Structure formats: structure tokens, C-alpha cells
Regions:
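Extended carbohydrate-recognition surfaces in non-catalytic/accessory domains of CAZymes
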Residues: 21-136, 191, 197-200, 574, ...
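Extended substrate-binding grooves/exosites of carbohydrate-active enzymes
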Residues: 30, 38, 46-67, 72, ...
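Accessory beta-strand-rich segments of carbohydrate-active enzymes
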Residues: 38-41, 87-90, 108-220, 242, ...
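Short flexible loop/turn segments that cap and initiate beta-strands
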Residues: 73, 247-253, 266, 299-306, ...
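Short, hydrophobic beta-strand segments
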Residues: 167-169, 286-296, 666-671, 764-786
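Extended acidic/polar, glycine-enriched regions
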Residues: 174, 238-333, 664, 672-673, ...
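Beta-strand-rich structural segments
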Residues: 235-239, 634-640, 679, 710-728, ...
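Short S/T/G/P-enriched beta-strand
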Residues: 332, 613-635, 691-714, 720-723, ...
Length: 794
């Protein structure tokens, strides 16, 4: 069998930070203070967009333009919002709206609430007029159009692709000369079959740089190992000349330092670029370095470094770019699996959409970090970014936390629309060590069973390798065989749908992993179906069509016991808005996650924690507040990594059972309010005791700041009874009282049938906000310092 060693196994990091000097590149965040209003799909109701005699497509900057893209347009009656701002979050629900998008009133049935307009006014100083300016949007959903000072810049159909526009010649300078950015986003059509939101839901930037600069997203840092462990680092890039004169005799200097700024021995070098670069011309460069004693990046040791690239002209620094990156090698072996820096890792993964209560698709950076940290608690070491690239900030967070990523492009195809998205994704995230695979598609049913699928994937494999020779690519199939013949790594969505063993016999050199596998999860804290109210019990406690109980265990043990499989990603990590299958309205969100929508754990999270971490786990389910089921026989399960588990119910010892690795233990018992106690044994000795007890009504609150970053706090609330016992069915209203300087950014409770207001609407600034808890938990996302006062309505 052959070993596939990813050459120059990459590295990198990629949140770019820049020197703040005037001559250097400066990345200016322009999220605050935008004007927002709904437009319409009918041009006559869309502020007259495009109806002028000379419209924005007729003349470059027609004086007849009067719509929101015109600098003279009056937006004083519009709402003021800060980005990211997903305008769909505040829309009502409707049982006739899109099932896949969570029954929000957006889409082709709702022309009056599917188009969002954004405007921002800013000024530049006269001394800034010698710089180059790019306007960037990390994500606008979707079918966006962008103008600056009335000049139409272009647009992007997809909601998941970064946009960059040169706006240098269109700008005004001076304190009395305004500049106006206008953006129109149209969420009429869906790209996904899951909630996608609408509008500018990711960050916006103004990038100021010198006219001679390092081409954005083209500086690459590559690492290759050597026998002595030191390895080689190659840094390469492109210089572009945006001035009106020839440029020559430039110099590029590279320095590798620790995050604290300490130089790495052997981590400095320079190269002259003698070529004459014509206006709008380019020059490529590369530098090889042999740094000593590098600490390599891995899921267990996510070591990172700063690689600073300085561009000089006659000894004068004209630009400096800092790339935060990590160094590591990847080996994919068709018989033994994945190796990072020579150490074997099994993929313990989840698939993940990117939305959250109160924010929708416009997730704050702090919330992205919170979500990844919560997943890591339960042993997750890999996330597949289903089914589109994540935000740059989430990718950087994965670097710092040691979470590997399978980063996925939005749509399968080989034309400019598809490959342009793929190229932008790879260019943006090439320097991130967390990214281990590029995924070029997911469940393309129309071509999974015929030769076209094979041809498309072969082309995409070659295109991917031409864009990045250091990583392999994959594609996910739901059952059709043709699209998993040609990729570097086959991705299987569900072992019940794919003949994985047969493919192994037919293609023994193929590398493969489980790109999706069922968790079997249901509604957190629900053990009896209540589908009329949008809640369902976990499928794990009901036999599947093959007779299997505990489907999540079926998936893990299948991949665990086959060393030739890299591992698996469960569908999903968090619940997400939309796609509430198999339920319909009033359910509005999925229930596939091991964590609910807000990040509170379901029972399945503890199953994975028992299998994927070394910490002792002894988790009892169900809870013991099963009102209405008195006298019924209940199967009490325990998820554990102990050797044996002993169970006591209401003072009666039900015995001690051996734990089959990867499985649960079960004890039938008649339900009566009281106490369930589990005791776990290792090597015959008691190691851990867990208790679940029937609680009284909620009377107390545990308030925890689960994560704090950038002045934003994720505050989790747990409801308890008078004795301090968790109240697992409590749904009491909670009120957060905001003090001066505090803003509620969002709230949620993990209820997959949530259909009420989750944040103040634009223009509202309440002193208090009320949210019901759901099955003992709730969450508030607060911006601003100071104590937080949350009260319980008993």
C-alpha cells in the first residue's frame, strides 16, 4: 500500500494583521453604524432601483441616479445597525414559509422582507489620497450589489464568498467630502437547505495599502519536515504595482517569531527582487528558511508562530504583513489512517452550520469561539464546515484551539462560478494549520450515480491540486458511488446508505472517512415524543431499521474498529435553525446536534465525551422528572467509560453491569419520583458517582459567563429548585435587566420550536428583556461591562 504524504504539509494561520504605519497596510473594520432598510423585489418598490432614465448600469456615475446608491440619498429614517447584521432574525415566523429555512418570512413568497439595503458614510483625510483602498465583505447573503459614491462596483451571487473591490479612484478626500457605501442584498433564493439569514452577516473592511504592495491572500507559508526534525519553511508571494510608474530593486524580508515576538533561530532571511515591475504588473518571489527547534502544531499542541513579511524600496519599509500560522505535516495512509507530525489521530468530528440564537447567521466572533470551545469539551477534534467556508475568525479560532477542519466549498462544479469560490476559499485559508482537507461538494444526488459525477470530481481534483499542492481534497456522497471513486479522500455520508466495506474490497488504496453520520439526537431533555409542539425523543432509544439501538454508538464503533478509515464527523455539533426534519411547523430548528442551538449538551454529548476523552464519564438518562409516567417501566441508560456501572433507584440496588466499550448499559426500572444513583468502577474500584434526582419547581438561578471576548459575554443560566437540584423541565420566564452601557445582542434557550423574539429589534433599546427558559436552561449574549441582573418569574 502507498502512503500519501502531503508535501509541504501546511501550516498556517491566516488571520492577517498589519502594521499601522501610514506607508503600510492597514485593515480598518467598518462594522459600526450602518443605515438599514428593507427594499423590495419589485424595482418600483425598491427605492426606484434601476428605474432611472440613466441607471447605474447605463452610466458609470449618472447624475440621474436617485436610489440608495446615490450619495445624495436621504437615509435618515432608516434604522442604525452594526455589522454583522442578519436581517432575517427579526422577521416573524409563518407556517407557510420555507421549511428548510426555519419558517421565517423570507424568500420568494415574501418580496417585501427579502431585500435588505445597507448604507455607510465615512470620510478620509487629504493625506490619505496617496494610498490604495480595497473594500471587502467577508459574506453577504446573497445576490449582492455594491456601490461606492454612486459607482457600481459589481456583485456576488453566492452568500459565502469574500468580495474585494478596488475603490481607490472613486473616493473623496477631506473632512467635508463624504464617501458613501451602498449594498443591496437579495435573499429571495436559497443556496442551502438550512437557515442562511440575509444581508451583510459577516465583517466589512476597508483595506488601506501602499500602491506597491504584497498581493492580498497570495503570501503563502509552507513547511516540509526533515529527518532531524527541523524542516524547511518556504515563504512565497506576489508583489503588485498599482502605481503609475515602473518599480524595480525591491527587497523582501521574512522573519519568523514566537507569538511573544522572540526571533526563531534560523527564521530570518531576505531576497532582492531586481525585476522591473510595470504599472499593474506583478513579480513573484519566494524565500527558503531553515528555522531551528520549531514546535509543531497539532490538535494536542496547537503551537503557532508569526511570520512577518516586509517589503522594502531602497531600504525603506513600504509594507509589512504578519501571518499567524503553525507548522505541521499530514500523512494519509489508506491502511492506517491520519497522522499529524507522525502521530496517529482518529477524526473525532462533527459537521457544523454557522448560526446561533439571537445572531442568526451574523455570529459574533466571541460566539464562534464559544461554540468551538464547547465542542472541544466533549472530545471533538475536527469540524467539517458544512456546507460552505466558515468566517476567517472561526478558522483562526480553530487554529488556536487545535481543532482540525475539513473546509467545504458551497457548490460542486468546474466553471468560473464554482472554481472562483474554491480559489477564494483556498487563497484565504491556505495558511491555516487547522485546515487538513478541502471538500469540493456534498450530496450531489444528480450526478452521484453517473459518469458525469466522476468526470466533474476528476477535474476538481486537478483544479484543487493546482491551487494547493499541499493538501488533499474530498467530496461527500449520500449513496452514489461515482463521486467517491476519483477524489483523494472519499467522504461517506451515513454507513446505512453507503457500501463502505464493498468499496474497501474494490478500491483497497482508497483513503476514506465518514463525512456525515447520524447522532440519533432529539430534543434536549425530552424523552417522550411531543411532535405537535415540535419536540421529539432521541432516536437512539428506538430501534433503527437494522434493529440497532443507540445509533450514535453504531457510527463510532464502525469507524473505531476499522483502522483504514480516518474517522467520522457526526451530523451535527450544534442544532441549527431550519431543516427540522422529521418534524414540521411548529418546529423551526433541527434536532440533530449533540448540543442544542445555544450549546447546552444533550445526552449524546456525554456519550462522545465517554469515548473521546480520558476524563471519567458517568452520565445517567433520562432525568427523573417524568411527570405523567408514574408506574411505567423506564429503561435507565448510563453512558460511561468505566469498566462496570452499579445502579440504585429509590434505594433499591439494581445490580452491577459490565460496560462494553463504545456501548451503553441499561437498567429497567419502574418510574416513581425519587433518586437515581450510578456508581462507576475501574479495575474493581469505585471511581465516580453520579446522581439524578426528581426536583421541585425552579426557585434559583445559576448564572455563568461561559465565554467573554471583545466586550461580549455569553451568559448561560441554569434553573434549580429550592434545594439546588437541577430543574430539567423548568421553562420559567427569565428577565435580564440591562444597566447603562449594556446591550443585549441576543438570547436563546435551545428550544427547536422557538418562535418568539430573541433580541431587541433595530431602533429598540430596552432596559429589560424577557425570555422563557427551556428545560432548565437559557442564554443571553450581552455587550458591555458590569454586573448582569437576571431574575426568575416563579
Amino acid at each position: 500500500m502507498k502512503n500519501l504524504l502531503v508535501p509541504l504539509a501546511i501550516i498556517g494561520a491566516g488571520v492577517l494583521t498589519y502594521s499601522a504605519s501610514v506607508s503600510s497596510r492597514t485593515l480598518i473594520n467598518i462594522d459600526p453604524d450602518w443605515a438599514f432598510a428593507f427594499g423590495h423585489t419589485d424595482p418600483a418598490k425598491d427605492f426606484g432601483r434601476g428605474t432611472e432614465y440613466f441607471n447605474y448600469l447605463t452610466k458609470a456615475n449618472s447624475i440621474h441616479n436617485a436610489g440608495p446608491y446615490s450619495p445624495k440619498f436621504n437615509d435618515s429614517l432608516w434604522h442604525r445597525v452594526d455589522l454583522p447584521f442578519d436581517f432575517v432574525v427579526d422577521l416573524p415566523y409563518d407556517s407557510l414559509a420555507s421549511h428548510s429555512h426555519g419558517y421565517k418570512t423570507v424568500g420568494y413568497k415574501y418580496p417585501e422582507t427579502s431585500v435588505g439595503w445597507y448604507r455607510k458614510t465615512f470620510t478620509l483625510q487629504p493625506e490619505d489620497s496617496t494610498a490604495h483602498y480595497d473594500l471587502m465583505f467577508d459574506g453577504i447573503f446573497r445576490d449582492s450589489q455594491v456601490w461606492v459614491n454612486g459607482f457600481y462596483l459589481g456583485g456576488e451571487p453566492s452568500g459565502y464568498t469574500r468580495q474585494r473591490y478596488d475603490i481607490t479612484p472613486y473616493l473623496n478626500y477631506g473632512p467635508d467630502s463624504d464617501n458613501v457605501i451602498a449594498v443591496r442584498s437579495d435573499a429571495t433564493f436559497e443556496e442551502g437547505w438550512f437557515y442562511e439569514g440575509g444581508g451583510i452577516y459577516r465583517h466589512a473592511w476597508l483595506e488601506k495599502s501602499p500602491l506597491v504592495r504584497l498581493m492580498p491572500d497570495k503570501t503563502r507559508v509552507q513547511y516540509s519536515s526533515s529527518d532531524n526534525g527541523n524542516g524547511k519553511v518556504t515563504v512565497s508571494g506576489i508583489i503588485e504595482n498599482l502605481s503609475h510608474a515602473d518599480i524595480k530593486d525591491l527587497k523582501v524580508i521574512v522573519n519568523i517569531t514566537s507569538l511573544s515576538g522572540q526571533p526563531v533561530p534560523g527564521g530570518a532571511s531576505s531576497i532582492s527582487v531586481p525585476a522591473v515591475i510595470k504599472p499593474r504588473g506583478e513579480a513573484k518571489w519566494h524565500i527558503d528558511l531553515k528555522p531551528q527547534d520549531l514546535k509543531l502544531w497539532s490538535p494536542d499542541t496547537p503551537e503557532r508562530y508569526d511570520v512577518t513579511v516586509t517589503l522594502q524600496d531602497n531600504g525603506r519599509d513600504i509594507e509589512s504583513e504578519r501571518i499567524r500560522t503553525g507548522f505541521r505535516t499530514l500523512t494519509f495512509d489508506p491502511d492506517k489512517g491520519l497522522f499529524v507530525n507522525g502521530r496517529h489521530y482518529k477524526i473525532h468530528g462533527v459537521d457544523q452550520h454557522q448560526d446561533h440564537p439571537g445572531a442568526g447567521a451574523g455570529i459574533q466572533d466571541a460566539v464562534n469561539v464559544y461554540r468551538l470551545k464547547e465542542l472541544k469539551k466533549y472530545g471533538i477534534n475536527t469540524v467539517r464546515t458544512s456546507h460552505n467556508p466558515f468566517t476567517p475568525e472561526a478558522i483562526a479560532a480553530a487554529d488556536s484551539l487545535g481543532i482540525m477542519l475539513v473546509e467545504e466549498n458551497r457548490l460542486l462544479g468546474i466553471n468560473d462560478y464554482h472554481t472562483g469560490q474554491l480559489e477564494k476559499m483556498i487563497d484565504r485559508d491556505f495558511n491555516h494549520p487547522s485546515v487538513i482537507l478541502w471538500s469540493v461538494g456534498n450530496e450531489e444526488w444528480g450526478v452521484e450515480w453517473d459518469k458525469r459525477g466522476d468526470r466533474i470530481v476528476k477535474d476538481l481534483r486537478n483544479i484543487s491540486h493546482s491551487l494547493d499542492s499541499t493538501r488533499l481534497m474530498t467530496v461527500a456522497t449520500s449513496s452514489g458511488p461515482t463521486v467517491v471513486i476519483s477524489p483523494d479522500v472519499a467522504g461517506y455520508n451515513y454507513i446505512m446508505q453507503n457500501p463502505v466495506e464493498e468499496h474497501r474490497r474494490n478500491y483497497p488504496d482508497r483513503i476514506a472517512f465518514g463525512s456525515e453520520e447520524t447522532t440519533g439526537s432529539g430534543t434536549r431533555g425530552v424523552y417522550f415524543d411531543d411532535k405537535a409542539n415540535g419536540h421529539m425523543a432521541s432516536l437512539n432509544r428506538t430501534p433503527d431499521k437494522d434493529g440497532t439501538l443507540n445509533r450514535i454508538a453504531r457510527g463510532w464503533t464502525f469507524y473505531r474498529d476499522r483502522p483504514w478509515l480516518l474517522g467520522l464527523c457526526y451530523w451535527t455539533g450544534f442544532d441549527y435553525r431550519g431543516e427540522p426534519n422529521p418534524l414540521v411547523f411548529p418546529a423551526t430548528g433541527s434536532e440533530f446536534g449533540i448540543l442544542d442551538y445555544a450549546g447546552f449538551p444533550k445526552d449524546e454529548a456525554f456519550y462522545l465525551q465517554s469515548q473521546w476523552t480520558d476524563q471519567p464519564v458517568l452520565h445517567i438518562l433520562p432525568h427523573w422528572n417524568l411527570e405523567g409516567h408514574e408506574g411505567e417501566t423506564i429503561d435507565i441508560w448510563v453512558y460511561s467509560n468505566m469498566d462496570e456501572v452499579e445502579l440504585n433507584v429509590n434505594g433499591r440496588n439494581l445490580g452491577r453491569k459490565k460496560v462494553t466499550p463504545g456501548q451503553h448499559v441499561s437498567f429497567p426500572a419502574v418510574y416513581k419520583p425519587g433518586k437515581v444513583t450510578a456508581k462507576g468502577y475501574k479495575n474493581g474500584k469505585p471511581v465516580k458517582t453520579s446522581v439524578t434526582e426528581t426536583s421541585g419547581p425552579a426557585e434559583k438561578l445559576d448564572i455563568e459567563t461561559a465565554h467573554e471576548q471583545d466586550g461580549i459575554r455569553i451568559i448561560n443560566v441554569t434553573l434549580r429548585d429550592r434545594k439546588g437540584r437541577f430543574a430539567p423541565t423548568a421553562c420559567n420566564p427569565l428577565t435580564i435587566h440591562l444597566s447603562e452601557g449594556q446591550t443585549l445582542l441576543g438570547s436563546g434557550n435551545g428550544d427547536p420550536a422557538f418562535r418568539i423574539k430573541e433580541r431587541p429589534a433595530p431602533g429598540e433599546h430596552p432596559d429589560a428583556f424577557t425570555l422563557p427558559a427551556f428545560n432548565g436552561h437559557a442564554q443571553f449574549i450581552v455587550k458591555g461591562s458590569g454586573p448582569v441582573n437576571i431574575t426568575l418569574d416563579k
